[in-house]
Amino acid sequence: MEAIRALNELPKNIAAAIRGLFADPYSLWADLTMTLIGMILIIVVIVISALLLIVLERKIAGWGSQRPGPNRLGPRGWFQTIADALKLLGKEDLTPANADRIMFKIAPMFIFGIPILTLTIIPFGYAMTVIDLELGVFFYLGITSVSTLALLMAGWSSNNKYSLLGGMRAVAQMISYEIPLIFSLLGVVMLTQTFNLTKIVEAQAALPFIFLQPIAFIIFLICGQAEVNRAPFDLLEADQEIIAGPFTEYTGLRWGLFYLGEYANLVAMCALATTVFLGGWQGPGVLPGWAWFWLKVGLLIFISMWVRWTFPRIRIDHLMHLAWKVLLPLALLNILLTGLGIYIYQLVIGG
């Protein structure tokens, strides 16, 4: 138990040691330095996670299709992603002649930068938050909304009909599913009376909110799958219909940033679900808190990959019907039931 406690305290002690290098450990420069170090670590985690998740998803796709998947490069094919990345870096970076060059070039940066910002407010473990915001839930939802604009920028600036159609699909889909996703989080906010993600995790010390908010958890998983544009909700890049959607004209490193951004958004969405519904770093003392956090995130990522390779892509009208006529009423019903439960608790037990 002492070893587990030491591992839990390790990030906090390292941060304290770095702050101790400054004359005032809590000065502006110390805060900026710690924030910069945290963001660099998040970028490293995102890149490593994406490299691992890409080959893992190909393995899961093979398992779901009763085939071995990549099995040539490295032990059982686990070096395949490295070879693909090197090949991608060697490709020519082309820009269409009639494209809006500025928007065309900054759209991939937005897609890759958004999950970096969202992960800065996620508590990965005890005292392991880059920026502990009181309005963490608001910040997350506000920043992720920008990805809709980035996809529309990519589609419109390419000056390609297929790209524009994919961008318009992205706007329709992500705005539609963002509303029930927001409402699914309101139940947890009502229970905890806070938007601070660290306080939400601490409120789950006795019982994760998945047991108190099962409807909200299911709604969040479905909407999260749609928000990160993964099957069966990947209509914006339906290759049989519109080639690759807003990514059609992108090549080389810029296309790679979109690819990395997809997996980074997946990690960020699963990290938020773990924080809000699965107790974050809370868990039995056999592992340090940050290990429990990443195990839960890994489980949700596996579920997302399993769904992608199990269910077929749905039609656009079915997509909209599910969001507006099924998930949104369920989310509103969950808010009503949560409010009723809180009232009964305060009236009977709390009073």
Curated annotation (Swiss-Prot):
Q: What GO biological process terms does the UniProt entry carry, in alphabetical order?
A: aerobic respiration
Q: Name one GO molecular function term.
A: oxidoreductase activity, acting on NAD(P)H, quinone or similar compound as acceptor
User: What residue ranges are annotated as transmembrane?
Assistant: 36-56, 106-126, 135-155, 171-191, 203-223, 257-277, 286-306, 330-350
What cystine pairs are annotated?
none
Look at the named UniProt entry and state the broad enzyme category this protein falls under: translocase
Concerning InterPro entries, the annotation shows:
NADH_UbQ_OxRdtase_su1/FPO
Record localization: Cell membrane
Q: Give the reactions, separated by semicolons, that this protein catalyses.
A: a quinone + NADH + 5 H(+)(in) = a quinol + NAD(+) + 4 H(+)(out)
Q: What GO cellular component term, any one, is given?
A: plasma membrane
Please state the span of the N-terminal signal peptide per the UniProt entry.
none
Task: Please tell me whether the keyword Transmembrane is annotated for this protein.
Answer: yes
E.C. numbers: 7.1.1.-
Keywords linked to the UniProt accession: Cell membrane, Membrane, NAD, Quinone, Translocase, Transmembrane, Transmembrane helix, Ubiquinone
Topology term for the membrane: Multi-pass membrane protein
Family per similarity comment: Belongs to the complex I subunit 1 family.
NCBIfam families per the UniProt record, alphabetical: PRK06076.1-2
Describe the function of this protein. NDH-1 shuttles electrons from NADH, via FMN and iron-sulfur (Fe-S) centers, to quinones in the respiratory chain. The immediate electron acceptor for the enzyme in this species is believed to be ubiquinone. Couples the redox reaction to proton translocation (for every two electrons transferred, four hydrogen ions are translocated across the cytoplasmic membrane), and thus conserves the redox energy in a proton gradient. This subunit may bind ubiquinone.
Assembly and interaction partners:
NDH-1 is composed of 14 different subunits. Subunits NuoA, H, J, K, L, M, N constitute the membrane sector of the complex.
What's this protein's name?
A: NADH-quinone oxidoreductase subunit H
**Annotated gene:** nuoH
